[in-house]
């Protein structure tokens, strides 16, 4: 689908400050616990935005080409499995990544051209889903010419909600396919040794040398206590 799909609603978010960090924080708090991809034009901006949000105790992660591959994989996995509902990224995430269910796209920086705009917006409102795109502009910035300038201005609620806490957390296991470990082994271990019920375990992703498991956040502390020192399949 292109950037103009009727299922995609575009909003303009006006910032009175040239530095848009505070208005981004306010927007993300208002959007709540919904899968949101925030696009910046530069790697250092991604790191700066992520650092600002995390310092304000806002749960988010980052994704850009300067990161090590395992760190990029971990960030994407947490975003996919619901451990982290907000991902701050360069245009690296605008194409080719399979991340279903993204509800919001935020343009922290205006896209460099129409193609980038189309690819960014193409992350949401996919197939039969609907989605929202938010363009953050300083009050003196113009809407890029390839975007209709009669877009609706986003109105913030009078009372700003607190940051939403993710329902899931990610458990990292330092063994994977090379160790003959599979999903059934991991889930069985979590049920038997970790006291987890079926609804406490979410997405399981087994890589060559390690695995990620989504666990209900409220049960993570109890799980770590129960499995400390235990082995999966004797490894």
Residue ranges and their predicted role:
Residues 1-7, 28-32, 52-56, 68, ...:
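Conserved catalytic network of the ASCE P-loop NTPase/AAA+ motor domain
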Residues 6-54, 195:
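Conserved interdomain hinge at the start of the Helicase C-terminal
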Residues 21-26, 47-51, 118, 179-188, ...:
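Ser/Thr-Pro-rich, acidic low-complexity intrinsically disordered regions of eukaryotic RNA-binding
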Residues 86, 95-110, 132-136:
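A short beta-strand element within the Helicase C-terminal
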Residues 1-5, 64-66, 200-209:
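RNA-recognition motif
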Residues 86, 113-155:
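Conserved segment of the helicase C-terminal RecA-like domain
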Residues 156-235:
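Non-catalytic terminal extensions of ATP-dependent helicases
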Residues 46-52, 58-90:
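Conserved helicase ATPase core of P-loop NTP-dependent helicases/translocases
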């Amino acid at each position: 689908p292109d950037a103009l799909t009727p299922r995609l609603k575009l909003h303009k978010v006006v910032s009175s400050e040239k530095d848009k960090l505070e208005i981004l924080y306010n927007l993300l708090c208002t959007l709540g616990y919904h899968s949101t991809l925030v696009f910046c034009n530069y790697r250092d901006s991604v790191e700066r935005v992520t650092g600002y949000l995390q310092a304000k105790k806002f749960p988010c992660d980052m994704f850009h080409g300067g990161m090590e591959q395992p760190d990029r994989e971990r960030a994407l996995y947490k975003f996919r499995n619901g451990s982290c509902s907000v991902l701050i990224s360069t245009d690296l995430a605008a194409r080719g990544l399979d991340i279903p269910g993204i509800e919001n796209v935020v343009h922290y920086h205006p896209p460099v051209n129409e193609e980038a705009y189309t690819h960014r917006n193409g992350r949401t409102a996919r197939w039969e889903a609907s989605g929202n795109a938010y363009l953050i502009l300083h009050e003196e910035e113009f809407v890029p010419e390839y975007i209709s300038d009669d877009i609706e201005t986003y109105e913030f609620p009078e009372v700003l909600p607190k940051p939403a806490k993710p329902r899931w957390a990610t458990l990292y296991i330092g063994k994977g396919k090379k160790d003959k470990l599979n999903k059934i082994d991991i889930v069985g271990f979590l049920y038997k040794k970790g006291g987890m019920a079926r609804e406490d375990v979410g997405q399981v992703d087994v890589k060559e040398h390690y695995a990620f498991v989504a666990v209900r956040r409220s049960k993570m502390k109890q799980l770590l206590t129960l499995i400390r020192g235990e082995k999966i399949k004797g490894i």
